[in-house]
Amino acid sequence: IPHFHDTEDRLCQLRASAQADVCGRVREAGPELDFIFSREQELGTLCRMQRSGALPLRVTHNDTKLNNVLLDEKTGCAKCVLDLDTVMPGLSACDFGDAVRFGASSAAEDETDLSKIFLRLDMYRAYLEGYLDACGHALTENEICVLPLGAKIITIELGMRFLKDYLDGDIYFKIDRPT
């Protein structure tokens, strides 16, 4: 999937959708667009580091959440990884970040009460410890340093994808409640 976690490209796509405003939703989405575009420099950090050679490409899953792991019913141990259609070269920080986005959240992905959604630091620390125990020996110092940034960027990147789709008329992410 070309440019899947290319946050700079996602920013360009979002900007184009905002400029086109085909559904007349930009005014309503103004605060969200301001939030994202005011962080543009930070959001491009991983892309710039990869282009400069500071971060290597790895084999990544790109949809690292618990429901993409088949667990043994008796032992609870992982049997295999599922949903392999997004496996491709990518950054370790993106896989780690996506796992944290999903697994260290205080609420389900589709929670509508925003006051219930926050990062569970205990779960974040557990993810970080487990990730480094399992593969830290294979990561560069730069990769380890940007793992926290990966969690932030991937979370905002997914928000950008949702926002772009909203501006475009809810084409990819189907919704079942008022916008």
Predicted regions mapped to residue ranges:
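Active-site capping/gating regions of soluble enzymes
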Residues: 64, 123, 147
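A structural signal for short hydrophobic/aromatic patches embedded in well-ordered alpha helices
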Residues: 36, 127, 146-147
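Catalytic activation segment of kinase domains across protein kinase-like and atypical kinase folds
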Residues: 53, 67-108
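Active-site activation/catalytic loop segments of kinase-like enzymes and analogous catalytic loops
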Residues: 89, 93-137, 153-172
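Surface-exposed helix-capping loop/turn segments at secondary-structure junctions
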Residues: 1, 135-142
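ATP-dependent phospho-/nucleotidyl transfer catalytic cores
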Residues: 1-61, 66-80, 153, 174-178
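All-alpha amphipathic helical-bundle segments outside canonical DNA-binding/catalytic cores
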Residues: 139-151
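Conserved helix-loop functional segments at active or binding sites
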Residues: 41-49, 84, 102-105, 133, ...
